[in-house]
From Swiss-Prot:
Protein name from the UniProt record: Protein translocase subunit SecA
Binding residues annotated for ATP, in chain numbering: 86, 104-108, 499
Self-association and partners: Monomer and homodimer. Part of the essential Sec protein translocation apparatus which comprises SecA, SecYEG and auxiliary proteins SecDF-YajC and YidC.
Group of enzyme by EC: translocase
Source superkingdom: Bacteria
Membrane topology: Peripheral membrane protein
InterPro entries according to UniProt: Helicase_ATP-bd, P-loop_NTPase, SEC_C_motif, SecA, SecA_CS, SecA_DEAD, SecA_motor_DEAD, SecA_preprotein_X-link_dom
GO molecular function: ATP binding; metal ion binding; protein-exporting ATPase activity
SMART domains recorded: SecA_DEAD, SecA_PP_bind
Keyword Membrane: yes
EC number: 7.4.2.8
Cofactor binding, note field: May bind 1 zinc ion per subunit.
Amino acid sequence: MFSILKKIFGTANDRTIKKLFSDIAKINSLEPAIQKLSDEELKNKTVEFKKKLKNGATLDDIAYEAFAVVREASRRVYGMRHFDVQLIGGLVLHRGMITEMRTGEGKTLVATLPAYLNALAEKGVYVVTVNDYLVSRDSASMGKIYNFLGLSVGCIVAGMTDEAKREAYNSDITYATNNELGFDYLRDNMKYSLQERVLRPFNFAIIDEVDSILIDEARTPLVISGPVNDNSELYGKVDKLVRMLNVSDFEKDEKLKTINLTESGISHVESLLSQADIIKPNSGLYDFENLSLVHYVNQALRAHNMFMIDVDYLVRDGKVMIIDEFTGRVMEGRRYSEGLHQALEAKENVKIQNENQTLASITFQNYFRNYPKLSGMTGTAMTEAPELKDIYNLDVVAVPTHNKVTRRDLDDEIYGSKKEKYDAILKLIKDCYDRGQPVLVGTVSIEKSEEISNVLNKNKIPHKVLNAKFHEQEAFIIAQAGRFKAVTIATNMAGRGTDIMLGGNPEMLIEQIDRKSLTNAAYKEKVNEIKAQTAEEKKQVIAAGGLFVIGTERHESRRIDNQLRGRSGRQGDPGNTKFFLSLDDDLMRIFASERISGVLRTLGLKDGEAIHHPMISRSLEKAQQKVEGHNYEIRKNLLRFDDVMNDQRKIIYEQRTEIIKSKDSYDFLSSTTEELAKKIVLTFMPAGSYREDWDIENLSVELHRTFAIKLDQNLISKNDVTEEEVTKIVIQTADSIYKSKEEAYSPDLMHNAVKYILLTTLDQVWKDHLHSLDHLRQGISLRAYAQKDPLSEYKREAFNLFEHMLNNLKELFIQTVYHFHIDLKHIQKEDISLENKKLQNNMHESREDPAFSKYNAGSNLETDLRPVISRINPEDRDPKNPTSWGKVSRNELCPCGSGKKYKYCHGLNE
């Protein structure tokens, strides 16, 4: 019934496209007049549009004419005129939606339309893509259109200085990777002045390969971290012990990706730890003093049994490098958290890097939800439309192709074993190679790529391998995968963003010419030769059937399979796609094996035979839908928890910005001093209590620790003194201490010093708070066993932790302000710069680049007081006299000598 109604009325997408075509007619009606304009008149349209916007017009009011102008500029600059379907894609993007356009339909050119239009508002437009190569390529090629129309273009890649980034971000249109944008956002919120920040306020972002960024990478947080204690030796010891465990010592669930020790496994581990003198004889792994070891054992277990080399990670230059499960690319600089990366380093016997503590983090989900207007482009989004709508409030519109798709998607072939499957793949590749038809073989991992490569090598079939190990040649290899007799093996969607042109990509081949060694005439001759060669090969390839895409197994997501299929048949080209499966494939084995095995047994499948059966296809699709649903729930659940931290992050970042903007820090200091003075006095002199109940000794200690005040004992000895009078005197005394500092150092210097102390203290308590939230998050799921909702419990406790953090901030801030002194002799720019460099070397994000340090704040005397603010040295502390300790970090060992952390000893009640 539903299918009949769809045929009569069309789908919602069909109706949307129909409406958009009426908009396109209006743009097309403007084309004749726009074409008559001179180059100068066309450029002046930009000035005209900006004036209209300043006079009250909206972007929608000028959208049709602006699109017509960009189309004409593109025709004049590049000789490329936007097709009507590309104009539809541009309108979809401008209206804050996601446009699904097939591979080869010119998404890069489509982005110029909404980017130009929205840049006219002079608030900045970010075009976001997945790697530095695409950023450089697209900004250079499309930048010529923008420049022709009088707009500036910026390009953000890894390794740029803050000055260069600031200039690029302040361009009208900026091309950047999602990683750089996210990290720059975190770094900006760790700077000490607004002038040091590089990003503009959030406005409009167009995300290329939007499904990759908002879906595939949604669970991957961007993290800036700093080093903590070195436990590399312990990781090595535990790794050796875990290698001795038996299969019966642990249980693993591949569906849920979990692993746990069995009862016998716990006993075995305890025995091994005892023999290695890591724990005391007869003590247990879960005894209080050994609890920290559980973390090391669990991570070593995961490293050895849940993570495979050349599938989940690879080892290059003595480093463990993560492989993106969706693209097959190396995730440069990324490290697994919670000690897992160290466990993998121990497993692979490479140098174990120090663990790091999170200083700032954000997920792409929450970063991109900051934009008032967001849109995206991809070749495959309809299967994820519900998630994109639910989480990001983004509708998906599937744009029709300019040319009819002639590609043939052949039925899957299922075999009993991997060997039989590889034999069938080899036979097909041989057939294609013999007739000259190019083949692209898609695999799910580096390991599978190399298995296929070995099979082809044994059969002497020339081929190229494209995976994370050869990332540098990625774009060139994939661009030439459509040449005559080409055989290319690629991990998943490696090379995404680069079209495969039948016959080869002449522009990229021309770039390989050594221009310096040739005369102009010889160079032109070489160029013409390449163009003629690729044109001839294109004819041969079309005659052979176009690009044949072979999938070696189904991915967990139908969308990834569709992306692989989309490599063939661009712009109406011929082509074929086919998937080869076996019962050994991960998806079949974990999610669909029992049902399908039963069908195969019923049908009596013999060795070497393939089977095509509708029931198997349905089972596979159900398995994929099951996994997609499971992954969606994980991302949705992650977002629910991350929203708690995100709300707190927004508060902290907004407060931080307000502190930086503030012209006078005295008001906050004064109000906080008054609040703490009342709190301390009432703690030791409770309102309405008898005099003999007052704890004057500890009141004196606390006032000295907090405000550097020595309490006048004569005052307390008065019979009629009240807690209000003591509070008033404390506030007045503290204020006089501050005023004396102002007289000694100048009000301006004190203002900047107080502002700096407040910012650094805020950074410190926020860092500790993130650590506390991490620990809370790890164990919160256990509350379900007590019939409590983990999310509600997490929200409640996270709020309590946040309140505690704010109280801690006030106390540490006040203590530091009243105890510090400034050595005026050392206020030198050179000292500040040197100190910055030292501090930078101890900071890194997932790229481990010290230039991204939160201390990379320049050498401005108004904000840089780091080297001249003195604190009490640990050596000068008297263990028996807490008043001599000054400010003590909560995670530092208590100065009293107990061996406990300060927060569990003298700092317990803080």
